Amino acid sequence: GTLWPLKSPEQRDCAFLRACDDCCRLAGAPQEQFVSGIERDLEAQFRYDKNPMMTWEQLRGLTRRGHIVGSHTMTHPNMAYVPDAELRTEFVESKRRLEEALKSRVDHFSYPCPALSPHWGDRTVDASAQADYRTAVTTNGGPVRRHHNPLCLRRVRPTKDVDGLRWNLECTFMGRAV
């Protein structure tokens, strides 16, 4: 491995960005090993919530109340860098597990928000179609038009206040990405 100097804020920023880039190119067990290695080498002690995820019963409650639950991968990788065999597993297995637990069809997929771009492409769009998704939302900002491919939809980011909403609307109507 590479030894990175960590004495200055700039050196730490550079090492962090490089680690993010390297981590985003991995998926599954190799990604987990990479992160575990960093935790070990830095003697980091990260705080984890005891219950950071929703339970199956909470998800079923949402669907009973009319919410749509979509898939988001098994291991949260950058899908553009996942090998073909693992790509299929990320799409299919996350969908299958949700459908089995919720006893309902899962038609929608949301790409993980990566630290490295791109995070989707023609290969991932094809794989999402083969996994039988009807829509997939990317992390690319901007409005969605009728003619856009439903398997690589843009999104308008939520805002905390009216000024943020106003900015999103102005960008949308001026044709800029949000």
How should these model regions be labeled?
Residues I68-P77:
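Histidine-centered catalytic micro-motifs
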